[in-house]
Every structure is written in C-alpha cells, then in structure tokens.
From Swiss-Prot:
Intrachain disulfide bonds: none
Single biological process term from Gene Ontology: translation
GO CC aspect terms: cytosolic large ribosomal subunit
Pfam families, per database record: Ribosomal_L18p
CDD domains, alphabetized: Ribosomal_L18_L5e
NCBIfam families per record: L18_bact
Record text on subunit structure and interactions: Part of the 50S ribosomal subunit; part of the 5S rRNA/L5/L18/L25 subcomplex. Contacts the 5S and 23S rRNAs.
Annotated protein name in UniProt: Large ribosomal subunit protein uL18
Biological role: This is one of the proteins that bind and probably mediate the attachment of the 5S RNA into the large ribosomal subunit, where it forms part of the central protuberance.
UniProt xrefs under InterPro entries: Ribosomal_uL18_bac-type, Ribosomal_uL18_bac/euk
Annotated source species: Parvibaculum lavamentivorans (strain DS-1 / DSM 13023 / NCIMB 13966)
Family listed: Belongs to the universal ribosomal protein uL18 family.
Length: 118
C-alpha cells in the first residue's frame, strides 16, 4: 500500500516539476479530488497567492453537488468565471498526478467552456 502512495506522490511531483517552467508565465489551475468532493484553484506561483477557487462545497451548489462528473463540470465553469473576474484567462493545468479522465477531465472541459485557455 505504501508503495502505491509513494508512486502517486512521485507522479504528482514529476508533473509539478514540468509545470514549474510554464507557471512562471501563467498561473496554475490545481485540482484536488476527494472521495466526496472536487476542489480547484488558480494559483499565481510567482506571488504565492490563490487568485480564484471553487469546489463542489460552494454555496452556489447547495447540497446537490457531489462527486459525479456533472458536478465537476459545474465546478470548472464556476472557477473559470471567478478567474475571469480576477483578470486571468490563460492558465497551466495541474492535474496533480490524477489521470486525465472522469471528474478531472470534466472539470477541465468545464473550465474551457467557461473561457479559460490551457
């Protein structure tokens, strides 16, 4: 079990190392996926601040949002709207070691529909 956790952490760090070069120019859209909810935030690594954030726990969704793909897509759209309000349109997608499939893919597509470019 610990070997799987170690491999997952290595995959995430390898992904972030590649993104470090690109995130100097553009902010990073970071995704965290739990068993109950999905969280995303746009991070400006040069200043070390979170520019915009959204999750399936937001008041906008009430109690209806959860772990499904549709909720992830809505979180992506909400994050894109908040990022555009903050003046961000171009980001680097940090999937955090997660496979680009299912909820992570739905969040990315929702953010693209909302107007983010990556």
């Amino acid at each position: 079990m610990s070997n799987m956790k170690t491999l997952s952490q290595r995959r995430a760090m390898r992904n972030r190392a590649k993104l470090a070069k690109a995130s100097v120019v553009r902010p990073r859209l970071s995704v965290f996926r739990s068993s109950k909810h999905i969280y995303a935030q746009v991070i400006d690594d040069t200043r070390g601040v979170t520019v915009a954030a959204a999750s399936s726990l937001d008041e906008k969704f009430g109690k209806k949002a959860g772990t499904d793909v549709a909720a992830a897509g809505e979180v992506g759209k909400l994050l894109a709207q908040r990022a555009k309000d903050a003046g961000i349109t171009d980001v680097v997608f940090d999937r955090g070691g997660y496979i680009y499939h299912g909820r992570v893919k739905a969040l990315a597509e929702g953010a693209r529909e909302g107007g983010l470019n990556f």
